[in-house]
Amino acid sequence: MAQPRTRPQLNADFLAIMVRGVSVIVSASDPDLVPSVMRAVGSQVSAEGEHVTVYLNQSQSKQLLRNVATTDRLAVVFSEPSTHRTVQLKARGVRVREASEADVPALQAYLASMTVELGKIGIGPTLVAAMLAHRLDDVVALEFSPEEAFDQTPGPRAGQPIARAA
């Protein structure tokens, strides 16, 4: 009998940076484990971290999206540039959909958060806007529920799994 899926229990610090909106890097490997990596142009995380949506420019993410379609695996890293606090999530069962007008508030909130966050390390709003530029008709949303989580903050705990909830 298959084990029921559990979800990682994310601590309050990791949840806070994820919900607020920090740098998000999305990756997926092909069947030969060759990775494809893209910067997200937005994210939305539920308060408890059980539902995550990351937004990508579809035209720039074709290989990554093919990899997700082929392997149904995804890894996403949330990293706070000013502190380097970083959490990596892994998941299967990824739902890919076109972004819609309903996603615009999440994309705008992400841009605002990243403008503040990157401003802390001297990156101005013009560069942030260019880095996260998108056309809504080119944006896809990848929705998932995390199955694994790892502390990737540089230091002695880097790479350690975050304990799972029962």
Regions found by a protein language model. Name each.
Residues 12-14, 24-27, 39-41, 63, ...:
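Short secondary-structure capping/turn segments at boundaries of alpha-helices and beta-strands
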Residues 85-166:
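Charged, gly/pro-rich active-site loop segments
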Residues 14-15, 65, 129-134:
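A generic local secondary-structure boundary/capping motif
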Residues 2-23:
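Short, basic/aromatic recognition patches
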Residues 42-83:
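A short mixed-secondary-structure module that forms the rim of ligand-binding clefts
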Residues 21-57, 88:
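Short beta-strand segments
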Residues 19-21, 69, 137:
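Short, surface-exposed loop/turn motifs at beta-strand boundaries within globular domains
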